[in-house]
């Protein structure tokens, strides 16, 4: 397995249109991101997956995205919970397994266990704060180690998983699944065992699902419960990524060396100052190509081989091009990614959609083989985007963009790559060279075609960055980049223009009827076969999206079903028509890759399924709303299909350039503006159409706080072979000019060329480049049309007012001084806003066609200025003017200025079309300036010293006519090559020499324009952000439309302003075809600000609306007000209700609608027909009281009153005199009549303000609340049922105490004694009731059989149970806020308002009486003393606080100033404590209403840490009519564990209930067995028909009354589950508490006895194991005589009680594997029969202070060992038995085999606790060479006894006394069983003699023979000699 390293980039901009450059989706695109299935351990050898095909391998590459929310880009709190439950089939002998779990750099480990099937059951918490996308890229790693091994190979196996996989699962959780472990380094090894785990991802506000832990019901079949089923077992694959070449890499190195070469006359090559190499990273592996030095177009021709398990846990193959640096770190050039989910398909993602949600599985099965494919890509170029290309020696502020963090702002080259996938894992090199044949094959994919691009700029508006002149540059790739000298010059930039004021707020560029045009040609591969399909699918998606929006709006507007059905039918019909339309074929197309064919097949199949599903839905669907989910799924699918990973054409990038610096940019995907000859549908969405583009700043830290500019631009892109098609798209007349400027200076009173200093006689617009008329040569294909002419530039001042009816001129008056001196006129007394010299006010005359609206120039004091209008600044050299201005004068200030303004308006007597005749002076065309470089003006002044005029020469195409001729303008205008050296030198200085001066000027002139009239109807806003300290804002809105803007009035102190204002833009000239404007009109942009008296107004948010265009005034369609979101920094900050209509205006304005009525001068209201239709409505307000009010300005709130505002009406309550004593209002009901819209969509919110009445008349607002949705408070006053009436809802306070309910204290003791006695007899307790209620019947004993009733266990808070309506049926609780909203936080909560509302319509006819009031006869507002009982049952999954991953929890109760800290009863070392505690205390309501239950972690030495807390509103429980103060049990018992505990009996509660419902009291009959209530008859028999009657039940009438009460929807006896929260992670669960609360008012007497919920204690048991014999044990040793033998003994223990290990004596010298023991093991243990778990309490370490309690399943482990005296004993084998699922043993050893223990073959098992004892043979096994072998058989008797039985039938360990039950005799071992070391005689007898008997006999005979022979030969010579001497003897 490949280790994983999270990618450094986890965030990118969702608007990145580069296709393949997207690192990771964000925002809306995140739902389009597919997430691969992550594994790190599946092996091809897993059973159940033979012969896998490619599509089976890829089947789960792509996860479903439907479960993934739209993820934000903001860091959030998350919690990952991992529970390690148990292991199974772990390899190894006598191992000690431990699991380490790593998530996001945090690692936790389990406790060390023993055996091959360990049970862990430990949970780990990982708290992280990161963006969702970063989190989903993190991985979860399980590593299983053998802790007993100190070798390096102690890792047994591992499994890796992506957090994103868990997040995509239902509930963001993987519940109790087995994961397969494998060896990460050995791809050929098999499974290394299994782990059962649960995994949860808990986000903000998420509730983790409840994990069921029923061991009996759990599926233990590993294969069927694998996390990834065996059918999709993963295989090793190899990714071959071929990297051929790159091009257009920008300069990355300093040009110092090149500059030195240049000085000495050598050739320089600055374009190749880069040393590129490519780094490929995937799944933690990084591989780099070779480095190629000094080459901007390198050719690597290398292949990278990546071996991985597939499908992989990693989504992106990341390619980063680096520039190698010798001394410093390598610089990133750019980063791009191959997203596996986009270049592969599983096949399983194709489903047949239908309205019932049941797809056709047969169809799905047949198509998976057709459409599934492994990752493949290219050969194709991948584009790189990042920071601007211009090289500087300074650190790049946008360097992060080059790593893929954020949207790249500039093209930085591209890389040609190809990816193929092979299903093998043969070991090969990581990187190798590509063969020459492959290089030749890829050549055909690089064929270039010429593309032409033309962009016409219609307007540039909403500019706020003013100052220097502005131009725009359009580039595609490197083509058109004015600062890049590697490409030939193109007319890719507009002329410089200065922004001018629009008279209201913004600035714009005054292009008027002459629109700048840029044109460029470029060369790219022809990928039209891909982009045509993309455009067709996008058009289809847009239509479906639009239809879905229309349908949703119709549903929201509650249109009739017939109308809804029409809209729905139109949507379905359009979709069917779209999907039936054939797609362009790939046949005969060039550059078609494998991926093209596969994606084409995928698209065709998907469209077919969507079409079939739509046809089926059309015929079968009945509910329109129910089909929306499925239709939106189709939309998601279409959006995925429209993505094109092989989009090699770079984006069109528009740059805004100011003072030769890049300021802001926009990226337009090329396919959106691309012309296609296939069909009109295949053309780009905006091809040849005017679109609105909002520019943005690179890496904008303010996140869109300010828009640099809003552009209206028309872009056309197409192949040069179809460039004539451009003629049909073009509007206006294109003009092409060469341009130069004639410069003169004033010297000695004469104008001439002397005195020009560095300026030339003829130059470009900047004056820095010398030009000559003769040096201009027209481009190829063009010729001069006429001679050079003077073309005077009209002053910008006269163009600033184009289209305006009124205008404000501004001039700044300047004064200067030395610090501390007197103010005197500055050298430049009058300037413009930029500090450039301007004429004095007396010299400025009113332009032609205008008249002054003011008497004279006025000082503007409505700014940050002093009372005379001055603002002050300090000039710091070398600057010549201050950079900032302030309103207060200081001694050190050197400059001051004030703004003079004068309004003028159109002269109605002058026609708009007539123009003033040019004076002779103007015809000369001179522009004047005081100094070179200053702003020019037309009228000469005495201070002027410099003048210039523009000469232009028009060009015409020589061989081509029409607008398309502009595409021939390639290259710069030719220049005279015989220029002097100065000219040559200047040409080398900057790239600007090539651009601007020498490129032709293209413009588009519109002879005809259309005058429009815009009306913007701004009605109201809601939910705006508070930006003032008084918790409100003072909002106003700037509304911008093209070059006009207007501002609404300011509404003070509100977050929900109602402007009700119509902004009228009387005449707006728009150039272009009206039908094109109607199709894509300019946007209306509304920017909302908070007005501040001091300081700059703060930005609240922005909204964009598209106006409704009316070209035919006869069609009277009124625009509809709609809510538009207000956005600020990608955050939703409210909504704006507005509409806009754009009407084409006739000259006299006769076709315009009449003006709306005025509310004030020049403030028009929204007219009837557009404004909402209103109705007189009554709002009744129940103002019950205020709670938990926090101090304001260091003083507590003591005398508050409440103000309610709605629809312009205001009512106020009386003042509460003393909030601490009486927090309720004296008079609780307010009434107001309001005109509210009938349509709920337009209803304004209700605003609640709390005002504190303080000394000296101060009345600060100390809290406010906005209630936006009023629909839930609407009611029909005539149909209100009596039981729902608010005044009848409070039962407890109005019922009088009755004496017979008082429980006498003296009766309680014998009752308790009887109860305890019964408990002993019945062996049931409250926990029996609890477990019976949760369904854990095995834990409740005889409880259910006895006929006892259960309670209700809610898995949530009681307030969240839907039928109890949040317990707010009497009154709701509204949080009060105060203060300014900071960037990250919401306004702080400062209190609560308890109250409610009733809203109903009033009759329009005043003669009709008003409906009856809703809030009447309310209960008293005085305090009530109550007894509160808090029952804490248990904690669930608490957040660990100790280093060991556990917690020592205890309970802390806080009620106002009363605190109960139960520190003494902490529960050590657990995350799931069983508290079983009850607390009782008294309180006064409503003053002490908030009951806070906290869980703390006990620490001995340090401060206790809070785990979490939950707060209960006791007042709501007390006042609710649902009886939540004390839940109703199912039966009425007067004794036993279910004894009645309420103060009132059921009959009394029923009587009160009847009185509250205004119905007759209940009537009993038949001795209380029959009851009549609410006109219904009830009998006791019908309720107790199937119930078992027991002795604890009360009298019949009480039982029957209780049964009737339980039918009335009251709260039953219950246990609720409350989530704990902490301030550390405010919205993430820190665990849960199961608990409930009872509240009893003391006025009704003492309550019944409390429940005893003390936890159960474990019972003592004894396991007796008698080891009789062993057989067929492995013979592990050889004796000295060579015999195979073993000295056998048996060792055993219960897991958790390892310190009580026991072993038999040794059966020495077993020669046949047989051992005889007759040995008894006695294992005492504590056991909970109800939970079937053993309780083990022990200290984890010797330094631990507390014992840790573990709950483990009861198991027995027995091991067979070989005894060695002089070395370590040898391990032979083991058997592990689960005492609950004990394998039934074999009766005879011959039938004892592996099959007994084979879980997969479902061997027979039984519970030893039920059978009590078992006897027979069990097999033992061991592991050898990775396989299990039979290590022997063991005969045993197993017996489980409880403590009582063990005392009655005693038995000793081994054969010790008392040796009974049964008596064990010494084993009848053979005589050969002994220890040779201690028995030498037996050794001689049984080892030596038995083995070597014949050897000994032979040796003796041989010895005798040898002795005989020795004697013979010894005596033979003497005998012979004697015979010779004495022969006769």
From Swiss-Prot:
GO CC term, one of those recorded: nuclear membrane
Which residues bind Ca(2+) 4 per the record? 1442, 1448, 1497, 1499
Keywords tagged on the record = Calcium, Cell membrane, Cytoplasmic vesicle, Membrane, Metal-binding, Nucleus, Repeat, Signal-anchor, Transmembrane, Transmembrane helix
Its membrane topology:
Single-pass type II membrane protein
> Which SMART domains did the record assign?
C2, DysFC, DysFN, FerA, FerB, FerI
Q: Domain (C2): give its ranges.
A: 62-179, 218-354, 996-1124, 1159-1283, 1408-1527, 1645-1793
Q: What Pfam families does UniProt report for this protein, alphabetically? A: C2, dsrm_Ferlin, FerA, FerB, FerI, Ferlin_C
- Tell me where in or outside the cell this protein is found: Cell membrane; Nucleus membrane; Cytoplasmic vesicle membrane
The signal peptide here is: none
Basic residues bias: where?
898-907
Regions of compositional bias (Basic and acidic residues) in chain numbering: 1845-1858
Region named Disordered: 1-53, 898-918, 1845-1867
The residues that hold Ca(2+) 3 are: 1028, 1034, 1090, 1092
> Per the UniProt entry, what are the Gene Ontology biological process annotations, in alphabetical order?
plasma membrane repair
Q: Which residues bind Ca(2+) 2?
A: 267, 323, 325, 331
Instruction: Mark the transmembrane ranges.
Output: 1894-1914
Give the residues the record marks as binding Ca(2+) 1.
267, 275, 323, 325
Main localization of the protein?
membrane
Spell out the family assignment given in the record's similarity comment: Belongs to the ferlin family.
Quote the function comment for this protein.
Answer: May play a role in membrane regeneration and repair.
The name under which this protein is listed is: Myoferlin
| Source organism | Xenopus tropicalis (Western clawed frog)
Top-down, what is the taxonomic lineage of the species of origin?
Eukaryota, Metazoa, Chordata, Craniata, Vertebrata
The gene designation is: myof
């Amino acid at each position: 397995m490949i280790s994983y390293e999270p990618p450094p980039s986890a965030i990118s901009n969702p608007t990145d249109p580069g296709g393949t450059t997207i690192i990771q989706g964000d925002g809306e695109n995140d739902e389009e991101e597919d997430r691969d299935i992550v594994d790190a351990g599946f092996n091809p050898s897993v059973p159940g997956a033979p012969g896998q095909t490619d599509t089976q391998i890829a089947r789960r590459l792509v996860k479903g995205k439907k479960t993934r929310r739209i993820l934000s880009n903001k860091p959030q709190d998350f919690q990952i919970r991992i529970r390690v439950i148990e292991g199974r089939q772990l390899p190894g002998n006598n191992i000690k397994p431990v699991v380490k779990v790593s998530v996001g750099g945090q690692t936790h480990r389990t406790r060390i266990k023993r055996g091959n099937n360990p049970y862990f059951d430990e949970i780990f918490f990982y708290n992280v704060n990161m963006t969702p996308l970063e989190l989903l890229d993190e991985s979860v790693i399980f590593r299983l180690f053998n802790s007993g091994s100190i070798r390096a190979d102690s890792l047994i196996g591992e499994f890796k998983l992506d957090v994103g996989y868990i997040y995509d699962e239902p509930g963001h959780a993987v519940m109790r699944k087995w994961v397969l472990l494998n060896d990460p380094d050995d791809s050929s090894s098999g499974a290394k065992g299994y782990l059962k785990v649960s995994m949860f991802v808990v986000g903000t506000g998420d509730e983790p699902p409840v994990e069921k832990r029923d061991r009996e019901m759990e599926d233990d079949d590993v294969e069927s419960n694998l996390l990834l089923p065996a059918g999709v077992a993963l295989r090793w694959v190899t990714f071959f990524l071929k990297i051929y070449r790159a091009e257009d890499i920008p300069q990355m190195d300093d040009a110092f060396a090149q500059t030195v070469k240049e000085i000495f006359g050598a050739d320089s090559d600055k374009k190749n100052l880069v040393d590129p190499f490519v780094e490929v990273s995937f799944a933690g592996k990084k591989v780099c190509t070779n480095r190629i030095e000094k080459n901007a177009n390198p050719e690597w021709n290398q292949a990278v081989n990546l071996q991985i398990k597939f499908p992989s846990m990693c989504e992106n193959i990341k390619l980063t091009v680096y520039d190698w640096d010798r001394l410093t770190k390598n610089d990133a050039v750019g980063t791009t990614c191959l997203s596996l989910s986009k270049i592969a398909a599983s096949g399983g993602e194709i489903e047949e959609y239908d309205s019932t949600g049941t797809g056709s599985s047969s169809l799905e099965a047949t198509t998976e083989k057709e459409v599934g494919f492994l990752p493949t890509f290219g050969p194709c170029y991948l584009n790189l985007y990042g920071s601007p290309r211009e090289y500087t020696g300074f650190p790049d502020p946008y360097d992060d963009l080059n790593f893929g963090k954020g949207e790249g702002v500039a093209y930085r080259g591209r890389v040609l790559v190809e990816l193929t996938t092979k299903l093998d894992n043969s070991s090969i090199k990581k990187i190798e060279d590509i063969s020459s044949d492959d290089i030749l094959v890829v050549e055909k994919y690089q064929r270039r075609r010429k593309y032409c691009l033309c962009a016409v700029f219609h307007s540039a508006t909403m500019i706020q960055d003013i100052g220097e002149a502005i131009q725009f540059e359009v580039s595609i790739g490197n083509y058109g980049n004015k600062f890049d000298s590697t490409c030939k010059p193109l007319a890719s930039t507009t002329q410089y223009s200065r922004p001018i004021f629009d008279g209201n707020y913004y600035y714009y560029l005054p292009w008027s009827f002459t629109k700048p045009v840029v044109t460029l040609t470029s060369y790219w591969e022809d990928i039209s076969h891909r982009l045509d399909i993309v455009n067709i699918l996008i058009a289809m998606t847009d239509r479906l999206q639009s239809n879905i929006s229309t349908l949703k709006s119709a549903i929201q507007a509650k249109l009739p079903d017939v109308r809804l059905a029409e809209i729905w039918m139109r949507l379905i019909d359009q979709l069917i028509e779209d999907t039936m339309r054939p797609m362009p074929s790939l046949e005969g197309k060039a550059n078609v890759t494998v991926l093209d064919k596969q994606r084409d097949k995928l698209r065709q199949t998907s469209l077919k399924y969507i079409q079939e599903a739509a046809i089926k839905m059309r015929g079968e669907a009945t509910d329109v709303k129910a089909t929306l989910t499925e239709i939106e799924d189709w939309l998601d699918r279409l959006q995925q299909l429209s993505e094109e990973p092989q989009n090699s054409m770079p984006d069109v990038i528009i740059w805004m350039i100011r003072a030769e610096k890049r300021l802001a940019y926009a990226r337009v995907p090329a396919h959106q503006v691309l012309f296609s000859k296939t069909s009109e549908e295949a053309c780009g969405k905006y091809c040849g159409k005017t679109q609105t583009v909002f520019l943005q700043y690179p890496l904008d830290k303010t996140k869109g706080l300010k828009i640099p500019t809003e552009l209206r631009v028309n872009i056309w892109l197409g192949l040069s072979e179809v460039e004539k098609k451009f003629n049909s798209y073009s509007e206006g007349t294109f003009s092409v000019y060469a341009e130069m400027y004639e410069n003169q200076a004033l010297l000695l009173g004469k104008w001439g060329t002397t005195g020009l200093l560095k300026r030339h006689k003829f130059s470009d617009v900047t004056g820095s480049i010398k030009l000559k008329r003769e040096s201009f040569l027209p481009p190829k294909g063009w010729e001069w049309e006429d001679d050079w002419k003077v073309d005077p530039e009209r002053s910008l001042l006269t163009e600033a007012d184009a289209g305006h009816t009124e205008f404000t001129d501004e001039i700044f008056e300047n004064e200067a001084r030395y610090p501390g001196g007197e103010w005197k006129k500055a050298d430049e007394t009058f300037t413009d806003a930029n500090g450039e010299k301007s004429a004095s006010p007396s010299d400025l005359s009113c332009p032609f066609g205008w008249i002054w609206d003011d008497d004279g120039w006025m000082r503007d004091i409505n700014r940050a200025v002093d009372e005379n209008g001055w603002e002050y600044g300090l000039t710091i050299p070398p600057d010549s003017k201050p950079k900032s201005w302030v309103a207060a004068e200081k001694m050190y200030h050197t400059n001051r200025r004030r703004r003079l303004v004068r309004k003028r308006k159109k002269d109605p007597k002058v026609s708009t079309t007539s123009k003033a005749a040019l004076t002779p002076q103007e015809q000369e065309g001179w522009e004047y300036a005081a100094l070179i470089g200053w702003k020019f003006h037309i009228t000469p002044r005495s201070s002027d010293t410099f003048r210039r005029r523009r000469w232009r020469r028009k060009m015409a195409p020589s061989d081509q006519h029409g607008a398309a001729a502009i595409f021939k303008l390639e290259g710069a205008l030719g220049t005279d090559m015989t220029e002097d050296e100065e000219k040559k030198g200047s040409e080398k200085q900057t790239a600007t020499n090539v651009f601007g001066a020498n490129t032709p000027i293209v413009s588009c002139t519109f002879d005809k324009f259309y005058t429009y009239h815009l009306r913007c109807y701004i009605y109201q806003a809601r939910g705006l952000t508070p930006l003032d300290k008084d918790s409100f804002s003072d909002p106003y809105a700037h509304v911008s439309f093209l070059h006009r803007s207007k501002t609404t009035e300011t509404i003070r102190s509100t977050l929900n302003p109602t402007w009700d204002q119509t902004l009228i833009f009387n005449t707006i000239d728009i150039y272009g075809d009206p039908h094109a404007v109607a199709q894509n009109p300019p946007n209306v942009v509304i920017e909302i600000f908070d007005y501040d008296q001091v300081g700059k107004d703060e930005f609240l948010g922005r909204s964009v609306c598209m106006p409704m265009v009316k070209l035919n005034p006869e069609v009277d369609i009124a625009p509809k007000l709609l809510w538009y979101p207000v956005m600020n920094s990608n955050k939703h900050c409210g909504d704006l209700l507005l509409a806009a209509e754009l009407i084409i205006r006739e000259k006299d304005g006769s076709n315009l609608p009449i003006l709306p009525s005025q509310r004030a001068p020049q403030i028009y209201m929204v007219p009837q027909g557009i404004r909402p239709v209103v109705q007189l409505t009554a709002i009744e307000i129940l103002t019950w009281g205020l709670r938990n009010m926090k101090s304001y300005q260091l003083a507590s709130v003591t005398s508050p009153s409440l103000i309610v505002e709605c629809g312009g009406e205001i009512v106020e309550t009386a003042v509460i005199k003393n909030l601490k004593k009486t927090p309720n209002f004296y008079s609780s009901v307010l009434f107001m009549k309001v005109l509210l819209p009938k349509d709920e969509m337009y209803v304004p919110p209700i605003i609640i303000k709390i005002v504190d009445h303080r000394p000296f008349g101060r009345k600060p607002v100390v809290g406010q609340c906005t209630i936006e949705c009023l629909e839930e408070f609407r009611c029909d006053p005539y149909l209100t049922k009596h039981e729902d009436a608010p005044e009848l809802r409070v039962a407890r306070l109005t019922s009088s105490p009755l004496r017979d309910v008082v429980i006498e204290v003296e009766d309680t003791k014998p009752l308790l004694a009887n109860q305890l006695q019964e408990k002993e007899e019945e062996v049931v307790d409250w926990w029996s009731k609890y477990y019976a209620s949760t369904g854990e019947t095995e834990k409740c004993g005889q409880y259910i059989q006895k006929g006892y009733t259960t309670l209700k266990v809610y898995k949530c808070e009681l307030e969240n149970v839907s039928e109890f309506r949040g317990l707010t049926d009497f009154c709701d609780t509204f949080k009060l806020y105060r203060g300014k909203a900071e960037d990250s936080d919401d306004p702080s909560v400062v209190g609560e308002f308890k109250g409610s509302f009733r809203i109903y319509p009033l009759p329009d006819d005043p003669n009709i009486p008003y409906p009856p009031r809703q809030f009447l006869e309310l209960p008293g507002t005085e305090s009530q003393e109550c007894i509160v009982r808090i029952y804490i049952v248990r904690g669930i999954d608490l957040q660990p606080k100790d280093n060991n991953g556990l917690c020592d929890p205890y309970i802390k109760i806080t009620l106002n100033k009363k605190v109960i800290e139960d520190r003494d009863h902490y529960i050590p070392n657990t995350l799931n404590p069983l508290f079983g505690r009850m607390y009782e205390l008294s309180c006064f309501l409503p003053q002490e209403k908030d009951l806070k239950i906290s869980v703390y972690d006990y620490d001995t030495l340090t401060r206790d840490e809070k785990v979490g807390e939950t707060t209960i509103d006791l007042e709501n429980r007390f006042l609710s009519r649902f009886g939540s103060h004390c839940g109703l049990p199912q039966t009425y018992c007067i004794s036993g564990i279910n004894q009645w505990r309420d103060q009132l009996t059921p009959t009394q509660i029923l009587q009160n209930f009847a009185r509250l419902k205004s119905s007759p009291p209940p009537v009993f009959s038949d001795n209380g067995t029959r009851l009549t209530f609410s006109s219904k008859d009830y009998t006791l028999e019908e309720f107790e028909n199937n119930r078992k009657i027991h002795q604890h039940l009360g009298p019949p009438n009480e039982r029957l009354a209780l049964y009737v009460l339980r039918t009335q929807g009251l709260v039953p006896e219950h246990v609720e589950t409350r989530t704990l929260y902490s301030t550390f992670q405010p919205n993430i669960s820190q665990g849960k508490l199961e608990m409930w609360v009872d509240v009893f008012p003391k006025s009704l007497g003492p309550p019944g006895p409390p429940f005893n919920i003390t936890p159960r204690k474990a019972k003592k048991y004894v396991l007796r194991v008698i080891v009789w014999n062993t057989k067929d044990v492995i013979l592990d040793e050889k004796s000295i005589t060579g015999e195979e033998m073993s000295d056998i003994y048996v060792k055993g223990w219960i897991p958790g009680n390892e310190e009580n290990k026991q072993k038999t004596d040794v059966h020495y010298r077993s020669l046949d594997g047989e051992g005889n023991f007759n040995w008894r093991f006695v294992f005492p243990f504590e056991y909970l029969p109800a939970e079937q778990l053993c309780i083990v309490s022990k200290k984890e370490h010797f330094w631990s202070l507390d014992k840790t309690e573990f709950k483990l399943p009861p198991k027995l482990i027995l091991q067979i060992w070989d005894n060695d005296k002089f070395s370590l004993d040898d391990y032979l084998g083991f058997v592990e038995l689960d005492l609950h699922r004990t394998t039934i043993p074999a009766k005879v050893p011959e039938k004892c085999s592996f099959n007994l223990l084979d879980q997969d073959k479902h061997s027979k098992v039984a519970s030893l606790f039920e059978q009590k004892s078992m006897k027979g043979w069990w097999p033992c096994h061991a592991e050898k060479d990775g396989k299990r072998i039979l290590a022997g058989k063991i005969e045993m008797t197993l017996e489980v006894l409880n403590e009582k039985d063990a005392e009655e039938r005693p038995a000793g360990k081994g054969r010790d006394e008392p040796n009974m039950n049964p008596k064990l005799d010494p084993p009848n071992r053979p005589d050969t069983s002994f220890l040779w070391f201690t028995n030498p005689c037996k050794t001689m007898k049984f080892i030596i003699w038995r083995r070597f008997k014949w050897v000994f006999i032979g040796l003796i005979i041989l010895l005798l023979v040898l002795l005989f022979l020795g004697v013979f030969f010894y005596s033979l010579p003497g005998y012979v000699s004697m015979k010779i001497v004495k022969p006769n003897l």
